C-alpha cells in the first residue's frame, strides 16, 4: 500500500470512527461525513488518473456535486433543529417527540 493510498484510507476510517463514536453534536457528525466524502473524492480522482480515460473523470465531479448537496441539506437540517429544539445535540433529537 502506497503512502497516498494509506492517507486517504486512514482519512476515511477516521471519519467513520468519528461518526460512530463521537455522536454528541449534529455539526460534528456533519463534519465527519464531509471528511469521508472528501477522502472518497480523492480516491475516485486518483482512480480516474490511473485509468487514464476521459469517461472516468466525470465520476469525481459528480461525487463532489452530491457532496455539496449533502452539505447544504445537512446545514439546513442543523438550522431547523437548532431553531425548534434550541440545541444541536443528537441526544435531544427524538422522532417520537415531534
From Swiss-Prot:
Cited function: Core subunit of the mitochondrial membrane respiratory chain NADH dehydrogenase (Complex I) which catalyzes electron transfer from NADH through the respiratory chain, using ubiquinone as an electron acceptor. Part of the enzyme membrane arm which is embedded in the lipid bilayer and involved in proton translocation.
UniProt cross-references to Pfam families, sorted A to Z:
Oxidored_q2
- What family does the entry list? Belongs to the complex I subunit 4L family.
Q: Which major enzyme category is it?
A: translocase
An example GO biological process term is:
ATP synthesis coupled electron transport
UniProt cross-references to InterPro entries, sorted A to Z: NADH_UbQ_OxRdtase_chain4L/K, NUOK/Mnh_C1-like
Q: What is its main location?
A: mitochondrion
Which EC number(s) does UniProt give? 7.1.1.2
Topology relative to the membrane, per the entry? Multi-pass membrane protein
**Electron transport is among the record's keywords:** yes
Q: Which reaction does it catalyse?
A: a ubiquinone + NADH + 5 H(+)(in) = a ubiquinol + NAD(+) + 4 H(+)(out)
Q: Which residues cross the membrane?
A: 1-21, 29-49, 58-78
Q: State the superkingdom.
A: Eukaryota
Listed name of the protein = NADH-ubiquinone oxidoreductase chain 4L
Q: Where in the cell is it found?
A: Mitochondrion membrane
Q: Which GO terms describe its cellular component?
A: mitochondrial membrane; respiratory chain complex I
Q: Which UniProt keywords apply?
A: Electron transport, Membrane, Mitochondrion, NAD, Respiratory chain, Translocase, Transmembrane, Transmembrane helix, Transport, Ubiquinone
Per its record, what are the GO molecular function terms? NADH dehydrogenase (ubiquinone) activity
